């Protein structure tokens, strides 16, 4: 099934759960870059994806949430290598279940102006690089998740629309002083 077809159905669509918590349970060390496991331990990543798909998730997020130049600084692998491996692992795990592989994109890890030093245009450029890598790797859709800055999400969405025709999902997290919504 194609992503566009999935979204035209009247049924509930289940997404996967947290990759980070599963990796921590598997022994991910503090300070490690979980996205590097796409290359160094693909079997672990595929196994986690397969568990979610077997449980009925129709959309599985690739292990690419932190794949940005800022967050991958010092990595032995390029952003493009990590995203390509992440999408490939996800697609292999999804195939037996007919689930879709989403390019999972999180915040860049830098604050945008005026609260930080990253210019809006530079954020659009960086998200464009991420989206192009996901498209080239064969992602079925894009999921922008856990954004707290509407301005940064706007940069991500503009980049996605400029560099892709894939369906897009987006989620935000807001604090209300008591809980995260």
What are these regions (language model features)?
Residues 1-181:
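Domain-level signal for soluble alpha/beta catalytic cores
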């Amino acid at each position: 099934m194609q992503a566009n077809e999935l979204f035209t159905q009247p049924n509930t669509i289940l997404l996967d759960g947290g990759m980070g918590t599963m990796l921590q349970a598997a022994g991910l060390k503090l300070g490690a870059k979980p996205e590097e496991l796409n290359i160094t331990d693909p079997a672990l990543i595929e196994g986690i994806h397969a568990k979610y798909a077997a449980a009925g998730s129709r959309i599985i997020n690739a292990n690419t949430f932190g794949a940005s130049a800022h967050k991958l600084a010092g990595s032995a692998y390029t952003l493009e290598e990590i995203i390509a491996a992440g999408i490939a692992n996800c697609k292999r795990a999804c195939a037996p279940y007919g689930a879709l592989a989403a390019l999972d994109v999180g915040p860049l890890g830098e604050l945008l102006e005026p609260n930080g030093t990253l210019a809006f245009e530079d954020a659009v450029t960086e998200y464009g690089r991420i989206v192009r890598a996901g498209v080239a790797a064969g992602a079925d859709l894009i999921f922008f998740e856990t954004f707290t800055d509407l301005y940064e999400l706007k940069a991500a969405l503009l980049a996605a629309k400029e560099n892709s025709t894939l369906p897009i999902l987006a989620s935000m997290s807001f604090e209300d002083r008591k809980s995260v919504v």
